[in-house]
Regions:
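Short, glycine-/aromatic-enriched active-site segment of Class I SAM-dependent methyltransferases
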Residues: 185-212, 217-223, 245-250
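Helix-to-beta-strand junctions that scaffold the AdoMet/dcAdoMet cofactor pocket
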Residues: 163-164, 177-179
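A short hydrophobic/small-residue beta-strand
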Residues: 116, 183-184
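A structural motif corresponding to the C-terminal end of an alpha-helix
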Residues: 226-228, 289
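Short catalytic micro-motifs in class I SAM-dependent methyltransferases
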Residues: 157-164, 186
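Conserved N-terminal segment of class I S-adenosyl-L-methionine
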Residues: 1-149, 153-157, 166-172, 235-238, ...
């Protein structure tokens, strides 16, 4: 992120969702930024998403964890739509959802009166989203062709950590924002309690799909380098329980503690965050151009 070449291996983490391969997470010794390195390039990473359990690309995914995700999504979509409407002065406007998945948030926003645009790399998810939203969903490459200043709000819900062209994409997203518009970025927090508690089994490392592993400090630095300030840092408390549920499944059988362990870890993570400057399992950053 900062351009330093002083890098050190931080962790060696296994992809327990798809390939079972091991990947290295490195940390910059200058700015503290953590990232998966080496990682598959954009042309070859698609195979690491080829799982019916990857719920953000597959509305038909089954099982307890995926059903829990869908129940939580029903409630969080409402909260997300209410939030963007509040940030836009209480009125619907023009929304760009970058990495819109199967389109549930877009559909909720459209129902609330927003003019919506969705971009999504997965062909399967695009088709699902198009049916759900009732309009075409484009590939991410379209971002560079969108008119400058055409959106009141741009959202990335657990997407930025997947983007190969990090700086270029951020610049294009900022360009698409109108003056005074808001950029919302939700990402896992590598300095959360549950990240430390589950360590190598922490599901939100999600290598190699997650290329970057942000903390509030490194997110602040990244956005500042693009001329943005963080106006709000909002908790995503349900993520602590969902990530803990996935992480318990990643543990060896003899170390799993079932739903009791999930509830304890989720509660402890949120309690820790409330006492330590909002270090939640996932954080939603509301950013805008610096004055």
């Amino acid at each position: 992120m900062c351009g330093s070449t002083a890098l050190a291996d931080k962790l060696h983490v296994q992809d327990k969702s798809v390939s079972q391969e091991a990947f290295t997470i490195q940390q910059c010794q200058a700015c503290g930024f953590q990232f998966t390195n080496p990682r598959p390039d954009a042309a070859s990473i698609g195979k690491y998403y080829e799982s019916d359990a990857y719920v953000s690309h597959n509305s038909g995914a089954q099982g307890l964890i995926n059903q829990t995700y869908k129940v939580a999504r029903y409630f969080t979509v409402r909260r997300k739509v209410a939030l963007i409407t509040k940030l836009n002065g209480g009125q619907p406007g023009h929304l760009l959802d970058y990495g819109c998945g199967t389109g549930h948030f877009l559909a909720g926003a459209k129902k609330a009166g927003w003019q919506v645009t969705g971009l999504e790399p997965s062909a399967r998810a695009r088709q699902d989203a198009a049916r759900r939203v009732g309009q075409a969903i484009q590939q991410p490459e379209v971002l560079a062709t969108l008119p400058a200043g055409s959106f009141d709000v741009v959202t990335l819900w657990h997407v930025l950590e997947h983007v190969h062209t990090l700086n270029e994409t951020l610049d294009q997203l900022i360009r698409a924002l109108r003056p005074g518009g808001k950029l919302l970025i939700a990402v896992p927090n590598v300095t959360s309690f549950d990240a430390q508690h589950y360590h190598l089994d922490w599901a939100a490392y999600d290598v190699p799909r997650h290329l970057y592993h942000f903390s509030p400090a490194t997110m602040r630095e990244l956005l500042a380098r693009h001329g943005l300030i963080i106006s709000q840092k909002l908790p995503m408390p349900l993520d602590a329980y969902y990530v803990s549920m996935l992480s318990e499944r990643h543990r060896p059988a003899e170390r799993q503690s079932g739903m009791v362990g999930v509830l304890q870890a989720g509660y402890q993570s949120n309690r820790y965050a409330a006492q330590h400057d909002g270090q939640y399992s996932s954080v939603l950053y509301v950013a805008e151009r610096a004055a």
